[in-house]
Regions:
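Peripheral, non-AAA+ core regions of ATP-driven protein-machinery
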Residues: 1-215, 219-226, 262, 327, ...
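Basic, amphipathic alpha-helical bundle interface domains used for macromolecular binding and assembly
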Residues: 35, 41-46, 61, 68-78, ...
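Catalytic P-loop NTPase motifs of RecA-like helicase/translocase cores
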Residues: 113, 301-308, 351
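Conserved alpha-helical scaffold flanking the Walker A/P-loop in AAA+ ATPase domains
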Residues: 205, 260-261, 266, 274-299, ...
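Walker A/P-loop
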Residues: 215-259, 321
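The Walker A (P-loop) glycine that initiates the GxxxxGKT/S ATP-binding motif of P-loop NTPases
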Residues: 218, 281, 303
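Conserved inter-motif catalytic segment of the P-loop NTP-binding fold
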Residues: 242-275, 282-283, 429-433, 439, ...
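Walker B catalytic acidic pair
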Residues: 296, 302-304, 314
Length: 507
């Protein structure tokens, strides 16, 4: 009987700080004490561990057992420490060998039968263990996540007995990976599925190339949602680093990560009834929200005025900083949240603001649109109207335009040009970088400033128009921003023009 030390990992946001599980067995009144700031679920592990050890045909020591989860000031939650606690008890009671424990880390929840159940946040733990050159033993069901870090680096097990057999040299564990048969079938959707709306498709191309936030405005049934769903198909796959960040966030929710297409950019479309916690993250134990699950991908908000205003306004800071900070009494938790925002809305409560179907006056339309705050609208680089198709378009077959593959090729070439010039896409350029990479001739700058005053736009909008113009120039292979690029960028300010028109009618 003595002391055993087992290495494990906690889960704090997308971080996996190390936790040392110290188990001491001594003579005295039989008891099981757990210290080190454990949550209720961790305290309950005492009963799970005892039953798992007995049902795995080991002896549970009838002595005084003290388990310390260090560091003590780090909050611990969930059943992820069941496996290391059980192994610590077996090692301290000399029922398994201790010589390999230093090179291993363990996470996993134990069933009463000794089976190891899956836990959240395995991927961040696997990355952290890899940095300190330790092998992480994970539950069988989490093997796919650990495999993203490296198949040869980590191991998975189905039961406590399997782990003990590996530590004692009786068998060698490997890393479980699901069958390739789960590979997702490639998408069959295409831009040519959409009849007409060539200006909307052009805006989609510009937004995809420069990663610009885009707002679709128009009556019901004109193709706003359909256009938004095609945006991800124009974007290149994530880099290894981006994909690992996104997968790490996904692993915190126990959503399945398909290792065969895990580099595809995420597309999240929350319902308009979503709460603030669902959208930006929260909870007693902070969990990522939709904006973090859309990290490095696309967040689509349909029927934007139907969202609560405070929920929409909570997006303002993450859109600028690229992260969300959730504060709790125990500390702050940070989640990455750099996403491309695409919104869609009807221009009035009835869906129409002009023509024979319009049934709302300018005052009620303004009241409806005021659910979107000015600072939030300011964060859209582009806003474009998607009108109803002209009469005869459907009967004549309509203009379906270019295929997704043709547009995607131009988008990828433009993005490569941006990355070669500044190391980032145009939407992420800061103020000083705009001055460096997006210079304007004096006459063009005066033209843009004049347009800015006529529309009543802010300095933030000024910078966003320049960045959109820079993207348009990149798509055309131009090194310098010219007047036509600025004019086209100003054309994508439909929301500003609508609000100015309604305000004038309401006077």
């Amino acid at each position: 009987m003595g002391l055993a030390i087992i290495h494990s990992r906690a889960s704090i946001g997308v971080q996996a700080p190390p936790v040392t599980v110290e188990v001491h067995i001594s003579n005295g009144m039989p008891g099981f004490t757990l210290v080190g700031l454990p949550e209720t679920t961790v305290k309950e592990s005492r009963d799970r561990v005892r039953s798992a050890i007995i049902n795995s045909r080991f002896e549970f020591p009838a002595k005084r057992i003290t388990v310390n989860l260090a560091p003590a000031d780090l909050p611990k939650e969930g059943g992820r420490f069941d496996l290391p606690i059980a192994l610590g008890i077996l090692a301290a009671s000399d029922q398994i060998a201790r010589n390999k424990l230093e090179s291993y880390e363990f996470i996993g929840e134990l069933a009463l039968s000794g089976e190891i159940r899956g836990v959240k946040g395995v991927l961040p733990a696997a990355l952290a263990a890899n940095q300190v050159e330790r092998c992480l033993v994970v539950p069988h069901s989490n093997g796919d996540q650990a495999a993203l870090v490296g198949v040869e680096l980590h191991k998975s097990a189905q039961s406590l007995l399997e782990v003990c057999a590996d530590l004692c040299g009786q068998q060698t564990l490997s890393l479980f990976q699901s069958s390739p048969s789960v590979q997702q079938v490639s998408q069959t959707r295409d831009l040519q599925d959409i009849i007409g709306q060539q200006q909307g498709k052009r805006a989609l191309e510009i937004a995809a190339a420069g990663n610009h936030n885009l707002l679709f405005l128009g009556p019901p049934g004109t193709g706003k949602t359909m256009l938004a769903s095609r945006l991800c198909d124009l974007l290149p796959e994530m880099s290894d680093e981006e994909a690992m960040e996104t997968a790490s966030i996904t692993s915190l929710t126990q959503q399945e990560i398909n290792q065969h297409n895990w580099k595809l950019r995420p597309f999240r479309a929350p319902h308009h009834s979503s709460s603030m916690a669902a959208l930006v993250g929260g909870g007693t134990i902070p969990r990522p929200g939709e904006i973090s699950l859309a990290h490095n991908g696309l967040l689509f908000l349909d029927e934007m005025p139907e969202f609560e205003r405070k929920v929409l306004d909570s997006l303002r800071e993450p859109l600028e900083s690229g992260e969300i900070v959730i504060s709790r009494a125990q500390g702050k938790t940070r989640f990455p949240a750099r996403f491309q925002l695409v919104g869609a809305l009807n221009p009035s409560p009835t869906g129409y603001y002009e023509g024979s179907q319009a049934r709302a006056n300018p005052q009620s339309i303004l009241r409806y649109l005021s659910r979107l705050s000015g600072p939030l609208l300011d964060r859209f680089d582009m806003s474009i109207e998607i009108p109803a198709l002209p009469k005869g378009t459907l009967a004549n077959g309509g203009d379906r335009g270019e295929s997704t593959a043709a547009v995607r090729q131009r988008v990828w070439v433009a993005r490569e040009r941006m990355l070669a010039r500044s190391g980032k896409v145009n939407a992420l350029l800061q103020s000083r970088e705009i001055e460096q990479y997006c210079p304007l001739l004096k006459a063009d700058a005066e033209f843009l400033e004049s347009a800015l005053h006529r529309l009543g736009l802010s300095i933030r909008a000024y910078h966003r128009i320049i960045k959109v113009a820079r993207t348009i120039a990149d798509l055309q292979g131009e090194a310098q921003i010219a007047r036509p690029h600025l004019a086209e960028a100003l054309g994508y300010r439909a929301m500003d023009r609508l609000l100015k028109q309604l305000s004038a009618q309401n006077v």
